[in-house]
């Protein structure tokens, strides 16, 4: 910071004293209607926000760089700074400037950080905003990772004896901030993306004894067993670190957190961060959100709570059949009734973010606009309920189950209706209390409706009709006192007064008190005039004070309803989640899959939902796929661009959707529940950690081989391509063998490869089955049929794909020559060996005698450019040629032969 002159004003002394306690935060210092920043903070903020940088006291010894933002618009500016990774300390005036003796007292009331914000301006409505804490006990070889969304009060965590697993979850949950004990480094394997790591003192944040007390106090429990934390000291420490950090930044103990619920991994399908990225669940491979992701396809939610529940279910699909089938029942019920579903969508569209609204109200951070949003949301609850209830008969009665025959509510919905709470008492209170368009700030007044509070009504009447009340009093005195010439006046010295001429002053009644004598007039006051004047002068201030007190009382009353509000918010979130799945299924022609506890996966005419949406359903080619005990590992071959990766990804996505309880993009599907989905798809590297593409590939492969079980689903694409041909093929081969040996019968695997030699494993290793993406050669071109068919591909067609990609003709031609040369060399080398080695890969067995003869009599490689006629002959498909086409082609060749002969001569 700039070294200031010793001569400081009281204001700067106060500023620097406060700033000293928050050296790592930008200090927003409240001065009237602005927040001002000084010195280095001002220069940083002006640069990041692109606002004017000025100077306070430019002619004094202490020249302080300064910038400022209006109080009423501060949220937007803070949001920009938080997105850039800055911390912001809010320093408020904690006493009324009118009552201050000297400098107004100020103090930091909260510290805003990326992981602790609760205002809508700083949050994505449909995404959780997590603060995380990771702790590892080296002595016990155990650790924990916990996370909390302060804006909703939800928090959870997990305990593990595997440090790598904890870091995987930290990457998957992607907290905005991750708390670590001081001295702990991020491992090389962890890629945290936009997550900021915050080192905090272990003794103050991760201490077990004080942390246990902190957790029990925050949760209002006498022991840890009710929270699922008994016997998990590392998880207690991680939770305690979260609470300590929140108390430090929020300047208050947060009692709004929901009961802690440890994540039960046994109930959920586990999808790690790598697989989420490879399947493009939330972000495209280029890191962007929006079109091109599964989230973009599935998100037809209308409420922020429903959107966050969808995100949660995509992160943690079910592993148990019961919740999957319950979800399917509701989705199917809504899927079949378009009218009811649209009515439900219309009603839900009126609901705001009840979870975050109730949090801000509970923490006294809500604005009047938040209460209006809550009122509108509560008012929509009866309409939402009505969409679920059976339609009434003209007589006003409801039909019985027998009469509706098939219209019976699924159990989750009937249970929901039996516990439904319209919160009518609070909706009515908010309707009676608040105006339709209250000001943004409580202190501006104009919050409450007439009739809500008698004292406020009187003050409002005075403020609005004060002049009329004065004229009424004047008219009354003129009549009662018999003084028709009595006048009413006002000046700043004496205030309001009655005035009479000197001649008429002798006849004033006794209750008139003389205030001033002028040359031609006398001025008087009365008790009633003084009382009315006092009311008028103080009416505005008293009104604002009373409105603020009423608002705080209203806030306290509404805050008591938070458990009821959160209960209904959870119901609405589930309704929104279910209708979103039903709406997506109806729009895209998806079907309800059969989800079972076996291991078979059967998909008929499966589609990739994202690719289909991008290309259009008319051009997308669906595919069948079957995995059972005889087909545990499918080896998929075919050229690049043929669609191997699409088949791999769509299979994993269909399984994920099925275990969410959603419908799937297929004509028919039967899915054996998986415990984990693993993927190794596409090229990636981690240059920051010095890890090459091949190293990352091998690390991910190693993790799959260590963690996959018989119930897992593994998709592997091009294992071994990042190294030499024989190294890569050997590794791919060994991985296939290992996958078929593991878990007592092999792991369900889709394995795409260009190493055609590996396809010889079918028939040699039980469970291995060859499939390929069909193509067709036509008039020298290749046509991608995108169809998955049995058997291995006959060749890779890599050079043809290069030609289609626009590689120069000379390069393609030369590649063909080199390929032919390499193939002849390989065949000749095979002919020199008399017997195969025992270690020769089955796919590399020696050629037959006839193949050896063919090799011997093959012509030597040409040194020049290959004749165009030879290219045409080799590329022709005689099976699909008519006699007329053959004659036409021969004529063309004859002309071509003559042209080339003339060129040579």
From Swiss-Prot:
Residues noted as binding ATP in the record, renumbered to the chain: 638-645
Claim: Nucleotide-binding is one of the keywords in the record: yes
Positions of the UniProt region annotated as Disordered: 389-410, 826-847
Protein keywords: ATP-binding, DNA damage, DNA repair, DNA-binding, Nucleotide-binding
NCBIfam families linked: mutS1, PRK05399.1
Record-level GO cellular component terms: cytosol
Native species: Nitratidesulfovibrio vulgaris (strain ATCC 29579 / DSM 644 / CCUG 34227 / NCIMB 8303 / VKM B-1760 / Hildenborough)
Biased segments, Polar residues type: 831-840
Protein family (similarity comment): Belongs to the DNA mismatch repair MutS family.
Gene: mutS
Function of the molecule: This protein is involved in the repair of mismatches in DNA. It is possible that it carries out the mismatch recognition step. This protein has a weak ATPase activity.
Protein name: DNA mismatch repair protein MutS
Pfam families hit by this protein: MutS_I, MutS_II, MutS_III, MutS_IV, MutS_V
Example GO biological process: mismatch repair
GO molecular function terms attached to this record: ATP binding; ATP-dependent DNA damage sensor activity; damaged DNA binding; mismatched DNA binding
């Amino acid at each position: 910071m700039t070294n200031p002159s010793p001569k400081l004003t009281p204001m700067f002394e106060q500023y620097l004293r406060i700033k000293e306690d928050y050296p790592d935060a930008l200090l927003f210092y409240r001065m009237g209607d602005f927040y001002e920043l000084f010195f280095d903070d001002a220069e940083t903020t002006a640069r990041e926000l692109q606002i004017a940088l000025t100077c306070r006291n430019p002619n004094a010894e202490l020249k302080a760089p300064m910038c400022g933002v209006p109080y009423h618009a501060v949220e937007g500016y803070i949001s920009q700074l938080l997105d850039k990774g800055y911390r912001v300390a809010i320093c408020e005036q904690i006493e009324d400037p009118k009552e201050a003796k000297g400098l107004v007292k100020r103090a930091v009331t909260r510290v805003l950080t990326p992981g602790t914000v609760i205002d809508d301006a700083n949050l994505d409505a449909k995404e959780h905003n997590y603060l995380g804490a990771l702790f590892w006990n080296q002595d016990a070889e155990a650790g924990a990772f916990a996370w909390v969304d302060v804006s909703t009060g939800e928090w959870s965590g997990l305990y593990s004896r595997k440090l790598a697993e904890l870091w995987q979850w930290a990457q998957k949950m992607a907290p905005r901030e991750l708390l670590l004990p001081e001295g702990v480094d991020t491992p090389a394997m962890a890629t945290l993306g936009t997550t900021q790591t915050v080192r905090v003192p272990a003794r103050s944040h991760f201490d077990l004894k004080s942390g246990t007390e902190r957790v029990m106090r925050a949760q209002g429990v006498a022991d840890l067993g009710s929270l699922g934390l008994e016997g998990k000291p590392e998880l207690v420490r991680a939770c305690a670190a979260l609470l300590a950090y929140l108390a430090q930044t929020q300047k208050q103990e947060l009692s709004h957190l929901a009961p802690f619920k440890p994540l039960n991994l046994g109930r959920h399908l586990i999808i790690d961060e790598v697989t989420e990225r490879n399947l493009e669940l939330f972000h495209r491979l280029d890191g962007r959100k929006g079109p091109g992701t599964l989230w973009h396809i599935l998100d037809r939610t209308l409420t922020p709570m429903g959107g966050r529940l969808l995100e949660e279910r995509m992160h943690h699909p079910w592993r148990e059949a019961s919740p999957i089938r319950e979800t399917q029942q509701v989705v199917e019920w809504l899927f079949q009734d378009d009218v009811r579903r649209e009515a439900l969508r219309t009603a839900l569209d009126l609901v705001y973010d009840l979870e975050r609204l109730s949090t801000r109200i509970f923490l006294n951070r809500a604005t009047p606009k938040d209460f209006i949003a809550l009122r509108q949301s509560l008012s929509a609850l009866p309409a939402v309920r009505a969409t679920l209830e059976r339609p009434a008969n003209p007589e006003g009665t409801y039909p019985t189950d027998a009469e509706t025959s098939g219209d019976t509510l699924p159990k989750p919905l009937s249970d929901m209706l039996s516990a439904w709470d319209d919160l009518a008492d609070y909706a009515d209170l908010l309707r009676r209390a608040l105006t339709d368009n209250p000001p943004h700030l409580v202190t501006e007044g104009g919050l409450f409706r007439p009739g809500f509070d008698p004292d406020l009504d009187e003050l409002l009447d005075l403020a609005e009709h004060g002049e009329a009340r004065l004229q009424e009093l004047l008219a009354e005195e003129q009549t009662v006192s018999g003084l028709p010439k009595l006048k009413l006046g006002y000046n700043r010295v004496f205030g309001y007064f009655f005035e009479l001429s000197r001649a008429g002053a002798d006849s004033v009644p006794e209750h008139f008190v003389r205030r001033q004598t002028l040359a031609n007039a006398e001025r008087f006051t009365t008790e009633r005039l003084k009382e009315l004047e006092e009311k008028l002068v103080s009416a505005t201030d008293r009104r604002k004070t009373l409105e603020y007190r009423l608002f705080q009382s209203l806030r306290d009353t509404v805050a008591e309803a938070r458990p009821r509000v959160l209960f209904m918010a959870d119901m609405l979130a589930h309704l929104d989640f279910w209708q979103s799945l039903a709406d997506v299924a109806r729009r895209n022609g998806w079907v309800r899959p059969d989800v079972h506890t076996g291991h078979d996966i059967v998909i008929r005419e499966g589609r990739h939902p994202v690719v289909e949406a991008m290309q259009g359903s008319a051009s997308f080619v669906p595919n069948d796929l079957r995995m059972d005990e005889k087909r545990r590992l499918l080896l998929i071959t075919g050229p690049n661009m043929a669609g191997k990766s699409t088949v791999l990804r769509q299979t994993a996505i269909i399984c994920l959707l099925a275990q969410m309880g959603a419908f799937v993009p297929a004509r028919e599907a039967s899915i054996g529940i998986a415990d984990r989905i693993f993927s190794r798809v596409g090229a990636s590297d981690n240059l920051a950690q010095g890890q090459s593409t091949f190293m990352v590939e091998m690390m991910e492969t190693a993790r799959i081989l260590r963690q996959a079980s018989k119930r897992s689903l593994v998709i592997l694409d091009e294992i071994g391509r990042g190294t030499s041909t024989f190294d890569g093929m050997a590794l791919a081969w060994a991985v296939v063998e290992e996958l078929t040996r593991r878990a007592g019968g092999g792991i369900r695997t889709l394995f795409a490869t260009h190493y055609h030699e590996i396809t010889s494993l079918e028939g040699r290793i039980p469970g291995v089955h060859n499939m390929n993406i069909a193509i067709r050669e036509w008039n020298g071109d290749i046509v991608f049929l995108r169809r998955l068919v049995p058997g291995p591909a006959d060749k890779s067609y890599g050079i043809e794909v290069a030609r289609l990609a626009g590689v120069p003709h000379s390069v393609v031609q030369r590649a063909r020559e080199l390929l032919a040369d390499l193939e002849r060399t390989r065949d000749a080398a095979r002919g020199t060996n008399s017997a195969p080695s025992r270690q020769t890969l089955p796919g590399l067995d020696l050629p037959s005698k006839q193949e050896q003869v063919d090799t011997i009599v093959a012509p030597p490689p040409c040194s020049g450019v290959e004749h165009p006629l030879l290219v045409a002959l080799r590329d022709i498909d005689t099976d699909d040629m008519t006699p007329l086409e053959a004659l036409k082609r021969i004529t063309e060749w004859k002309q071509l032969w003559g042209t080339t002969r003339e060129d040579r001569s």
